[in-house]
């Protein structure tokens, strides 16, 4: 698998939300169902308010040797007192299966923790369509703090965990 992934020349450009991409991020929150941890829906105005209130909002453009997939990842992280809360993390299904979902989230967490020094919390809220993300956070270094009878899981990120991002991925923050 490593040889195959290395042969793809995968480049992930992680971009802070701006006027040029915020409508695409809003669109993704409204349409992405399968790989969506909390299935929160936001308008462009909602996202602008979140930015004004100090949230960190990113999107990612993924390209490989076959072409440019465009903006296919959205991530919203809120600052809540002494923690960062992963409000939303979602991906277009067309880029799944190349570990891009893992390396992008870990890169964003590492970036934000280096800037803020804050602990990261997250949540999984089950929906009719997002079962594929049920255990995703556990696979990328989060520990379950609690789970309620409806299947809502609350997590903390294990920041002591060594984050391995294979060197055949190129990650750029823009």
Language-model features, listed with the residues they occupy:
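Conserved N-terminal entry element of GNAT/NAT acetyltransferase domains
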Residues: 1-18
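Acyl-donor binding region in acyl/amide transferases
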Residues: 65, 71-148
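Short, surface-exposed amphipathic charged segments that create phosphate/polyanion-binding patches used
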Residues: 28-29, 75, 138, 160-162
């Amino acid at each position: 698998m490593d040889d195959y992934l290395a042969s793809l020349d995968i480049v992930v450009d992680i971009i802070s939300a701006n006027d040029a991409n915020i409508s695409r991020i809003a669109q993704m929150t409204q349409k992405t169902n399968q790989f969506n941890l909390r299935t929160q829906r936001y308008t462009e105005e909602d996202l602008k308010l979140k930015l004004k209130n100090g949230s960190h909002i990113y999107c990612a453009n993924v390209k490989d040797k076959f072409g440019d997939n465009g903006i296919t990842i959205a991530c919203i992280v809120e600052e809540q007192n002494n923690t960062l809360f992963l409000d939303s993390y979602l991906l277009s299904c067309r880029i799944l299966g190349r570990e891009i979902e893992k390396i992008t989230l870990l890169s964003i967490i590492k970036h934000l923790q280096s800037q803020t020094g804050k602990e990261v919390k997250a949540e999984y809220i089950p929906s009719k369509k997002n079962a594929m993300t049920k255990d995703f956070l556990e696979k990328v270094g989060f520990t379950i703090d609690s789970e309620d009878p409806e299947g809502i899981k609350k997590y903390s990120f294990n920041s002591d965990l060594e984050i391995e991002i294979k060197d055949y991925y190129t990650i750029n923050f823009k």
